[in-house]
């Protein structure tokens, strides 16, 4: 790593070279920007899917007669490739087959699935489960021919959190909030638990409680924490021993009823009745209660038996030594009774289903204790996941809490040596000693406790409970009061389920918080959030499908098993009689429909599955790197919590602080930072270089947010002085520790950033001079780049950041060379490369395809025959790509000045040159689909013989009735002629006879042709025809499908939206002829006039820097061209600098030399003075170039690029004296020929045409559909609706007294049905307009008033009244207006 001043030529590809002004040069290799989801889905297909299926097997029948085993997974080859899937509107997918075997344990036979018609061709064994979509090399899914993408979700990570306030979500959007010292246990699968000490009581009276949500989510129940510990199998003595008689724990024991010493005296009615029953000699254990109760009855009976033995022995031998043993045995038995009774109490309070334990295979016995343990200590019911276990282990380890505390006991190693003595202040060095000793398993602070419960359930079946404990003093000043700090043992690290050790360590953390031991968690910290990639999202969805399949399978096995010995099932799963028994097979048992439905729902209706944003390469790549906090289990967009949406310091280098939507989704939809990665647990990581003893090494480490919090990290900037051997020379440099920034000694710094722009996303990193823009404008600029419409002649920005090539390369819209070799053939549709091994590789190009956003997807080769190419080198430009660099717009000459008020309020004035020369012209491709269906009345037909359509309207249809490619179509033209059979009608005998004689002349069909929609004028670019007769797969009921693609060439026009990269946007208000535009003194007309008032208040000064630097880059190219005419040695270097082929540049120099010779110019200085833009323009046109090609490309990376001094140097080099003109130039008004009063800021700015074009928005309606209820016109362009004339518009007309206009608008132009029909008739007949009638909306109002029990009637001028119910608006009663004699009206339609 080294620092550079000024610039050097940086070559990104053979066609892309830029002047690089970055101050920091690094050899860090940027990761591929699009491969995160590709690798994730590949992992799912290769590992996760098989692991998921294997977790459900083996499945056994209730009586163990049958067992189904899973032996592996197989995939077929895809039936069609990516191109075919897109063309045929099919899914790019493979078949998934499971290798299952059915074992009959009675007969000892093993059966496997035989090949079916579906898998016989693929030579795949097994049961077909589902068709699984494949991810393409671009990282997208093709679902029904449409490219889709699954964005990642960021959620709170499972784990244990210490908070001052938390909540449990209940049903019906209710919440249960708890405040105090709260430990929130958040599992990946299972219910949230809150272990807390309430702040509603004095700390001297408070005790530890637990809040649990019931099984039906209707409410939440509170228990003393010791009640739960006892239900898990601990007794009073063990609890007090673990927590060393802590006062909070003592008060918890006092608050509950399950204490051995007073349990019998305060016994609950159930135990009291059982004791009475067994003491009276009634020993029928099964007489009462369900199976789960039998354990409790058995324990009470055993206790009574011991009690009787004790009493009998005490009477006969009061001094017998065995009495003590009996007392201990009775005490242990009472502990077991308490455990079972406490467990029953919790189970009943939480409404936990007893079927879970009575039907489970996970427990060795049926008891409430076993049920409770199975619920909290089993993976399937309570799962922390790998990420959750990592978080829990990290949170509950001792060393996290004892920093800067004083040791209250001696710490010994296992060999008896003293590690740390009592009274030691635990700082980083001492804690590192403890960590190292624990890592080597040398320390002896691990406690082992024997459990007294006789239950044999789940984790508690182990004989011992392991936990770690260290005593520390509460304060370092008062060394008299100590508390135990309890942590979990390392053995738990691989266990995804909760353990009793976890509970105990969590309780210890809570009771230590009031003493200031431990720290609260920040739930907005990225260390407490994780990203769910597609493999996790689809696995979670598939679990529900496999669970349903497992349930169906078990039901069928129950029928097939000895449970119903005389019955078996057929392949549909139905019971068959004894006489028609069939052999049981795998296929008759497996029902895979739930899995197929789940996969289909996931890729079609899941909240995080979206249409891929194909607007341009940047929008596609940004879409793939987007993460959402919404989705299943996520945050609602209506949630007003600003803390969730705000920028957090832990997002540095992981999530972009700039790129996010502006609306209600702000802060909920985010983008990954440029270099961010995701680890195996889903935590975001940022790259940093390791610093050792003040020297920056080449070692790059990716750190999670939690690991980063442990280190001091420096920011890399041009202000840091670094020697040639990468040693930091400054005594102090800026660094950060967590959220604090300060000056640090380089020897104390652990890491340094790899690059300044690692903090922002790829979209934000494209904005030059980002550091000079206001954050709100930077956000707008980032978002608007994604809306840029691909142009037919795109140009890469003159002032870039150096990221343009990387984004174009990783976007997937360009094409790279598959090998190293020489180009042997190039045309419009393919490129052939002869590799170094003489093998020919063909690269097929995409031509004028339609994208999801109706943009034109077209490839253009950028190599020539005989050119040498390297592997993975870009050889084909895609849409919005120019010479392997991202090109979202055009470099245009702009001036900041007003112009007759036409650029008021951000409006933009443009030159007609942009229209005539197609500078900002784009292509839009619309798809029209016609389907020929099979109906109950007969099949539809594609034909040219369309009833009631003139030959003029069918002139472009071929003999089959399909539009010809290249035809220019207008609105309403027929694209595909199609007729549909009418419904069955009664036919007279004469018509039957006529039909029999002339069957073809009388057709009972109607016109259902596909026509060009409103505003869809264009040229037909392609027609695709699919038919069942040709073997194409179509949807049910579809005989034939025809797709017609119509291309629109959209020139820039008034109403279109333009924007720069700095959040500067506006709508075109005027297109001015070139001769009327302001121009420079040499005659160069300005392309765009921007309002200067749009700069200072928006605080995006970056656009001014870009303007000056861009103009200097253009002038530099002109000066270099002239210089090359006098020094031939500079020609090659000049060709590289302007990214043009050497041969073309030589022709350009030759042409300009002729101009110089003709004008007898002798020196370079004279040429610079006498040659103007018009002279150079003539030469450029002769060789097919324009001024847009004659410009230097500059890279100014954000936070380290061109500064004010560099800009002055560049302008000076270009002959623009910054001290003299300050970037302002004399402009002359093209209309008057007079110069403007003052010099005007002028330069070259990169402007983009956005996807907000007037052609898509402007709309007019003459006739159209009406609402059924109000009879008012519908709204919106899509429904051919009208323009709403609202309340404020009515006020405006009222203010001017325009009564008649207002009356027309509110009656005959809206919902006066009879009046508008009369008006139409009057217009046709040329008669006078009739009086308006009563609007339909008024009638609707009367009905609503009547619904409020109010009588409404009409009172006329002659004081006659009429009930509103008797007034027919649609037609007057009893009379027909004379206007309607010759007309028929459809009052419901047009």
Curated annotation (Swiss-Prot):
This is DNA-directed RNA polymerase subunit beta. GO terms for cellular component: DNA-directed RNA polymerase complex. It comes from Mycoplasma genitalium (strain ATCC 33530 / DSM 19775 / NCTC 10195 / G37) (Mycoplasmoides genitalium). GO terms for molecular function: DNA binding; DNA-directed RNA polymerase activity; ribonucleoside binding. SUPFAM superfamilies: beta and beta-prime subunits of DNA dependent RNA-polymerase. DNA-dependent RNA polymerase catalyzes the transcription of DNA into RNA using the four ribonucleoside triphosphates as substrates. Its EC number is 2.7.7.6. Keywords: DNA-directed RNA polymerase, Nucleotidyltransferase, Transcription, Transferase. Belongs to the RNA polymerase beta chain family. The keyword Transcription regulation does not apply.
């Amino acid at each position: 790593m080294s620092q550079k001043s000024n610039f050097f030529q940086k070559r990104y590809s053979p066609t892309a070279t830029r002047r690089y002004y970055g101050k920091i040069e690094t050899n860090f290799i940027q990761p591929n920007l699009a491969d995160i989801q590709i690798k994730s889905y590949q992992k799912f297909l290769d590992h996760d899917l098989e692991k998921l299926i294997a977790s459900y097997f083996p499945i056994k029948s209730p009586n163990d007669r049958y067992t189904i085993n899973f032996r592996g997974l197989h995939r077929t080859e895809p039936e069609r490739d990516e191109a075919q899937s897109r063309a045929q509107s099919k899914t790019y997918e493979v078949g998934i087959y499971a290798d299952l075997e059915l074992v009959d344990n009675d007969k000892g036979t093993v059966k496997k699935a035989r090949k079916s018609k579906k898998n016989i061709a693929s030579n795949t064994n097994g049961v077909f489960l589902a068709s699984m979509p494949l991810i393409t090399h671009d990282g997208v899914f093709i679902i029904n021919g449409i490219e889709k993408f699954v964005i990642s979700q960021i959620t709170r990570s499972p784990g244990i959190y210490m908070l001052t306030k938390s909540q449990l979500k209940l049903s019906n959007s209710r919440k249960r909030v708890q405040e105090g010292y709260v430990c929130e246990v958040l599992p990946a699968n299972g219910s949230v638990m809150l272990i807390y000490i309430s702040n509603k009581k004095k700390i001297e009276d408070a005790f530890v409680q637990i809040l649990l949500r019931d099984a039906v989510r209707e409410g939440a129940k509170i228990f003393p924490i010791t009640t739960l510990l006892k239900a898990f199998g601990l007794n009073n003595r063990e609890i007090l021993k673990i927590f060393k008689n802590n006062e909070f724990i003592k008060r918890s024991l006092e608050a509950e009823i399950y204490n051995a010493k007073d349990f019998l005296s305060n016994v609950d009615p159930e135990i009291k009745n059982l004791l009475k029953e067994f003491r009276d000699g009634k020993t029928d254990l099964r007489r009462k209660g369900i199976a789960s109760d039998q354990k409790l009855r058995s324990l009470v009976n055993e206790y009574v038996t011991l009690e009787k033995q004790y009493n009998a022995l005490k009477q006969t031998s009061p001094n017998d030594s065995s009495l003590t043993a009996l007392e201990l045995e009775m005490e242990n038995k009472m502990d077991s009774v308490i455990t079972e009774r406490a467990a029953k109490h919790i189970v009943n309070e939480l409404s936990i289903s007893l079927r879970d334990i009575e039907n489970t295979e996970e427990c060795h016995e049926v008891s409430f204790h076993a049920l409770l343990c199975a619920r909290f200590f089993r993976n399937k019911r309570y799962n922390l996941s790998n990420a959750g276990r990592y978080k829990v282990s990290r949170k509950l380890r001792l060393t996290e809490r004892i920093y800067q505390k004083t040791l209250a006991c001696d710490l010994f190693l296992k060999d008896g040596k003293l590690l740390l003595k009592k009274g030691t202040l635990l700082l980083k060095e001492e804690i590192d000693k403890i960590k190292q000793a624990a890592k080597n398993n040398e320390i002896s602070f691990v406690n082992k406790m024997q459990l007294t419960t006789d239950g044999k359930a789940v984790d508690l079946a182990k004989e011992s409970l392991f936990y770690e404990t260290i005593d520390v003093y509460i304060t370092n000043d008062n060394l008299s009061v100590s508390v135990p700090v309890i942590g979990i043992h390392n053995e738990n690290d691989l266990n995804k389920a909760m353990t009793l050790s976890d509970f105990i360590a969590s309780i210890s953390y809570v009771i230590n918080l009031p003493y200031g031991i431990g720290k609260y968690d920040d739930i907005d910290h990225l260390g407490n959030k994780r990203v769910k990639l597609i493999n996790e999202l689809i696995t979670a969805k598939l679990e529900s499908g496999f669970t349903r399949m497992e349930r169906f399978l078990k039901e069928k096995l129950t029928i097939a098993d000895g449970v119903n010995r005389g019955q078996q099932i057929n392949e549909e799963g139905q019971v068959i009689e004894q006489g028609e028994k069939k052999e049981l097979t795998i296929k008759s048992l497996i029902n895979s429909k739930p899995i197929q439905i789940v996969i289909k729902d996931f890729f079609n209706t899941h909240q995080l599955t979206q249409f891929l944003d194909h607007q341009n390469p940047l929008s596609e790549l940004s879409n793939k790197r987007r993460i959402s906090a919404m989705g299943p289990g996520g945050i609602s967009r209506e949630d007003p919590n600003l803390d969730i949406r705000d920028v957090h310091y832990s997002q540095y280098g992981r999530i972009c602080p700039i790129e996010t939507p502006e609306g209600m989704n702000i802060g909920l939809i985010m983008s990954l930072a440029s270099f961010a990665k995701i680890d195996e647990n889903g935590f975001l990581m940022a790259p940093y270089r390791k610093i050792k003893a003040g020297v920056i090494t080449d070692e790059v480490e990716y750190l999670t947010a939690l690991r980063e919090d442990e280190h001091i990290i420096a920011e890399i900037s041009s202000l840091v002085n670094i020697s040639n051997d990468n040693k930091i020379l400054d005594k102090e440099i800026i660094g950060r520790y967590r959220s604090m920034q300060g000056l640090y000694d380089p020897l104390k710094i652990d890491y340094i950033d790899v690059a300044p722009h690692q903090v922002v996303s790829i979209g934000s990193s494209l904005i030059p001079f980002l550091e000079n823009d206001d954050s709100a404008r930077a956000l707008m600029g980032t978002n608007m780049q994604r809306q840029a419409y691909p142009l037919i002649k795109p140009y890469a920005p003159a002032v870039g950041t150096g990221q343009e090539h990387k984004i174009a390369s990783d976007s997937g819209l360009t094409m790279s060379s598959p090998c190293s070799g020489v180009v042997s053939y190039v045309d419009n549709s393919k490129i052939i490369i002869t590799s170094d091994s003489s093998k020919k590789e063909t690269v097929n190009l995409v031509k004028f395809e339609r994208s999801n956003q109706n943009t034109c997807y077209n490839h253009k080769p950028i190599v020539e025959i005989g050119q040498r190419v390297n592997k993975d080198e870009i050889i084909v430009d895609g849409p919005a790509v120019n010479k392997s660099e991202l090109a979202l717009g055009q470099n245009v000459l702009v001036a900041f000045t007003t112009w007759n008020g036409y650029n008021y309020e951000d409006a933009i004035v443009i030159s007609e040159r942009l229209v005539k020369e197609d500078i900002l012209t784009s292509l839009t491709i619309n798809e029209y689909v016609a389907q020929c269906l099979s109906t109950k009345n007969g099949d539809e037909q594609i034909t040219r013989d369309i009833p009631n359509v003139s030959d003029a309207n069918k002139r472009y249809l071929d003999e089959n009735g399909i539009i010809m490619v290249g035809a220019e179509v207008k609105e309403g033209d027929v694209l595909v002629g199609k007729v549909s059979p009418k419904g069955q009608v009664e036919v007279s005998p004469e018509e039957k006879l006529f039909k029999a004689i002339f069957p073809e002349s009388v057709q009972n069909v109607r016109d259902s042709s596909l026509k060009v929609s409103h505003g869809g004028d264009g040229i037909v670019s392609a027609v695709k025809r699919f038919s069942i007769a040709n073997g194409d797969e179509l949807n049910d009921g579809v005989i034939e499908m025809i797709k017609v693609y119509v291309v629109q060439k959209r020139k820039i026009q008034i109403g279109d939206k333009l924007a720069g990269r700095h959040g500067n946007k506006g709508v075109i208000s005027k297109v001015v002829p070139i001769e009327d535009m302001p121009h420079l003194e040499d005659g160069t007309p300005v392309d765009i006039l921007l309002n200067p008032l749009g700069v200072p208040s928006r605080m995006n000064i970056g656009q001014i820097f870009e303007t000056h630097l861009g103009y200097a880059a253009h002038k530099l190219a002109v000066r270099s061209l002239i210089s090359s005419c006098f020094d031939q040695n500079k020609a090659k270097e000049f060709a590289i600098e302007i990214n043009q082929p050497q041969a073309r540049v030589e022709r350009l120099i030759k042409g300009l030399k002729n101009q110089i010779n003709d004008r007898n110019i002798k020196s370079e200085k004279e040429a610079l003075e006498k040659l103007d833009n018009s002279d150079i323009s003539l030469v450029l046109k002769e060789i097919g170039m324009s001024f847009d090609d004659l410009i230097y490309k500059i890279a100014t990376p954000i936070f380290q690029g061109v500064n004010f001094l560099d800009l002055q140097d560049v302008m000076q080099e270009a002959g623009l004296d910054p001290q003299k003109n300050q970037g302002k130039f004399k402009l002359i008004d093209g209309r008057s020929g007079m110069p403007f009063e003052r010099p005007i800021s002028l330069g070259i700015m990169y402007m983009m045409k956005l996807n907000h074009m007037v052609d898509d928005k402007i709309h007019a309606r003459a006739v159209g559909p009406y609402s059924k209820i109000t009879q008012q016109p519908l709204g919106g362009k899509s429904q051919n609706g009208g323009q709403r004339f609202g309340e404020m518009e009515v006020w405006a007309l009222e203010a001017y007294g325009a009564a008649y206009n207002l009356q027309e608008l509110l009656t005959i132009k809206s919902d006066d049905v009879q009046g508008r029909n009369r008006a139409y008739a009057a217009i046709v007949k040329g008669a006078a307009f009739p009086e308006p009638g009563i609007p339909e909306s008024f009638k609707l109002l009367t009905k609503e008033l009547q619904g409020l029990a109010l009588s409404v009637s009409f009172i006329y001028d002659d004081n006659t009244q009429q009930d509103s119910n008797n007034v027919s608006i649609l037609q007057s009663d009893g009379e027909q207006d004379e206007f309607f004699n010759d007309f028929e009206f459809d009052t419901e339609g047009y």
